[in-house]
C-alpha cells in the first residue's frame, strides 16, 4: 500500500542507492512499490473474483500491524514474503513463522536480490537453530518447507 519504507544499514549499499540515500529505517515511504488500497481491492475482488468474505486486508507497516494481528491470522499453509528489506522480512518471519503449519511452505521473493532479505532469513535460521533446504525458484526467489 504505502510502498517500501526506508531501508537500514543491514540492507546494504544497493538498497540505500535505490532509496536515494535514505537508509535510517524510518517507517516512511520512499515512494517505490506503492500499491494504493483501492487498486489492491480492484485486483482481488473485481479482476480475480476472490470472495471478499475470505480476505481481511490490514493496512499498515508490518512492524506495526503484524504484532497486533498474528493471532487473528491463524494457521498458515503457505507464507509468501515480499518485504524486500531486512527489517520488513525479519518482522514477518518473527511474527508469522509460528503460524505456519509443520510441513507448510515459506516463500521468500527477494532472497537472491536484496541483501537485507537474505540476511534476515539467514539470521532467522541461526536464531531458530534450523537449516531447511532452500529451493531456488528463479534468480531471486527461494522457498523451504517448515520442518
Model-derived features: positions:
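S-adenosylmethionine/decaboxylated-SAM
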Residues: 1-147
Amino acid at each position: 500500500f504505502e510502498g517500501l519504507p526506508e531501508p537500514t544499514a543491514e540492507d546494504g549499499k544497493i538498497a540505500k542507492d535505490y532509496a536515494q540515500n535514505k537508509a535510517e529505517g524510518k517507517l516512511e515511504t520512499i515512494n517505490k512499490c506503492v500499491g494504493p488500497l483501492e487498486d489492491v481491492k480492484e485486483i482481488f475482488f473485481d479482476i480475480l473474483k476472490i470472495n471478499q468474505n475470505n480476505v481481511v486486508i490490514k493496512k499498515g507497516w508490518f512492524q506495526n500491524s503484524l504484532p497486533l494481528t498474528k493471532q487473528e491470522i491463524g494457521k498458515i499453509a503457505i507464507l509468501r514474503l515480499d518485504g524486500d528489506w531486512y527489517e520488513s522480512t525479519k518482522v514477518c518471519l518473527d511474527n508469522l513463522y509460528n503460524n505456519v503449519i509443520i510441513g507448510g511452505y515459506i516463500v521468500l521473493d527477494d532472497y537472491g536480490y536484496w541483501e537485507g532479505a537474505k540476511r534476515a532469513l539467514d539470521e532467522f535460521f541461526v536464531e531458530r537453530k534450523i537449516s531447511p533446504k532452500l529451493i531456488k525458484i528463479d534468480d531471486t526467489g527461494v522457498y523451504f518447507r517448515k520442518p
